[in-house]
């Protein structure tokens, strides 16, 4: 488990206008909260934030409020990104205690070459993350799933794999992670018959134009 230092500025002003101004100045608006902590709006340097996201790293945060500094331990709980450019728009930090368990989502890493794929089947991955509960120091970087023995028509669920050391799965055991299907089953789009007339969708009268996507609330 990686551990990083991250500095953030405590902010008093909120709202979309404030958020846009922060982003123009290279800062990302955010908030930190926890079971025993009131939500506190923050601003984080975009470059610094991009260096620590992408995993379940533990963050030793320094919260700067004027001439005061406060130390907190946290993890990134949620990221909101621009749907087109992928830039981070807002970040949620969760305050944690190193002695209390927490629930996090861990990426699934597929390994092996399934027998069913060798026989001409298609691998479909239905779950890309699994929720686990553990102490912060036991958060795994990924959960390895070996699909070597899967044949055509086989599937593998959460209950079929062992949780990493010192962790418990929160995701239901019956949730399917991967399945091997025949090539014909992998084709989802139906092609209309040649003699089937395709009717145009009716025009909706009086429907208002959709506005721009709202930015996340700050």
Swiss-Prot record:
Alphabetical list of InterPro entries matching this protein: Rbsml_bL25/Gln-tRNA_synth_N (IPR020056), Ribosomal_bL25/Gln-tRNA_synth (IPR011035), Ribosomal_bL25_b-dom (IPR020057), Ribosomal_bL25_C (IPR037121), Ribosomal_bL25_long (IPR001021), Ribosomal_L25_dom (IPR029751), Ribosomal_uL5_bac-type (IPR020930)
Q: Which GO CC terms are listed, alphabetically? A: cytosolic large ribosomal subunit
The domain of life is Bacteria
Q: Which SUPFAM superfamilies match?
A: Ribosomal protein L25-like
Q: Where is the signal peptide?
A: none
TM annotation in the entry: none
**CDD domains linked to this entry:** Ribosomal_L25_TL5_CTC
Q: Would the keyword Metal-binding turn up in this protein's UniProt record?
A: no
Sequence segments annotated as region (Disordered)? 186-218
Keywords, comma-separated and alphabetical = Ribonucleoprotein, Ribosomal protein, RNA-binding, rRNA-binding
Q: What Gene Ontology biological process does one annotation of this record name?
A: translation
Which Gene3D superfamilies does its entry note?
A: Ribosomal protein L25, beta domain (2.170.120.20), Ribosomal Protein L25, Chain P (2.40.240.10)
**Which Pfam family, any one of them, does this sequence belong to?**
Ribosomal_L25p
Give one GO molecular function term: 5S rRNA binding
Subunit structure as annotated in this protein's UniProt entry: Part of the 50S ribosomal subunit; part of the 5S rRNA/L5/L18/L25 subcomplex. Contacts the 5S rRNA. Binds to the 5S rRNA independently of L5 and L18.
Q: What does the protein in this record do?
A: This is one of the proteins that binds to the 5S RNA in the ribosome where it forms part of the central protuberance.
Similarity annotation: Belongs to the bacterial ribosomal protein bL25 family. CTC subfamily.
What is the protein name given in its UniProt record? Answer: Large ribosomal subunit protein bL25
This protein's species is: Halothermothrix orenii (strain H 168 / OCM 544 / DSM 9562)
